[in-house]
Amino acid sequence: MCIRDSNKTIIIDSKSGYSGAGRGVHKKYKDKNLYESLSAYGLANHRHNSEIQQELDLKTGKKNKFHFTPHLTPMFRGILSTIYVDLKKGININKIIHVLNYQYKNQKFIKISKINTFLSTNDVINTNNCLISVCKSKYKDKIIILSAIDNLIKGGGGQAVQNMNNYYGFNQSEGLNV
């Protein structure tokens, strides 16, 4: 079920800890004392753009437009994304919560929060969880989706363990903290 107006552009604004950018950036932060700095990067050519495009198109069966703006923040780990979506006519926030709860009902590591819950990367540190919150916009035809993960667990080793468990038919949480 498509819940968004597919003629509109999705805006994805992601804030990431510098651990996800590699050793070079970690050294740059340390050497140049950039711990009080926030910076955007990879606007038109970020390495995840093609993956985002692929998954959006696969889910909707058509070409989608989106803008992905990643930012490096002065924190070591975690990713907090804010996603702005235009709704399809007749869709409201309660329907979206229903769809998300149905879609992820058997996923131990995806947690759907109550409407308008503000998320923090601290909510997921040292977990394999992805927290999702759907928030109301001041416009009735738009929503704001928040998601938070620990990029060193869910974005790395924890996701690899979960995928291996799924591949070999183990319980997906085997070896992971739930």
Residue ranges and their predicted role:
Residues 5-7:
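A short alpha->loop->secondary-structure connector
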Residues 1-3:
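Short, small-residue-biased leader/transition segments that mark boundaries at the very start
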Residues 131-132, 136-178:
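NAD(P)-dependent Rossmann-like dehydrogenase/reductase catalytic/cofactor-binding core
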Residues 9, 13-14, 18-145:
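C-terminal substrate-binding/catalytic lobe of Rossmann-fold NAD(P)-dependent oxidoreductases
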